[in-house]
Swiss-Prot record:
This is Sigma-O factor regulatory protein RsoA. Induction: Positively regulated by SigO. Together with RNA polymerase sigma factor SigO, positively regulates the expression of at least three operons, including oxdC-yvrL, sigO-rsoA and yvrJ. Required for the acid stress-dependent induction of the oxalate decarboxylase oxdC. The keyword DNA-binding does not apply. It comes from Bacillus subtilis (strain 168).
């Protein structure tokens, strides 16, 4: 039961982190998009935010091995 709660909390924190990241980059995105035509700005801004969300989600959800797991993997690979 606690595992599900922790997983939901972690997922909620990751979503908040991604939303915060997008909010931080939004002014820069809007400034850069001022060089594009008015009709394309909203679409491009939305596409950029989608790409940022996808990449951040991929990076936050990766399972990175610990130091010793990595060492054991390298030893097994070289054997």
């Amino acid at each position: 039961m606690d595992g599900q709660f922790e997983q939901k909390k972690k997922q909620k924190d990751e979503t908040y982190d991604i939303e915060h990241l997008i909010a931080c980059f939004s002014p820069m995105i809007r400034k850069k998009l001022s060089n594009t035509s008015y009709q394309e700005r909203e679409d491009l801004e939305q596409e950029l935010k989608i790409k940022m969300f996808e990449k951040a989600d991929m990076l936050l959800c990766q399972d990175v091995p610990g130091f010793w797991e990595f060492i054991l993997y390298m030893v097994d690979e070289n054997s």
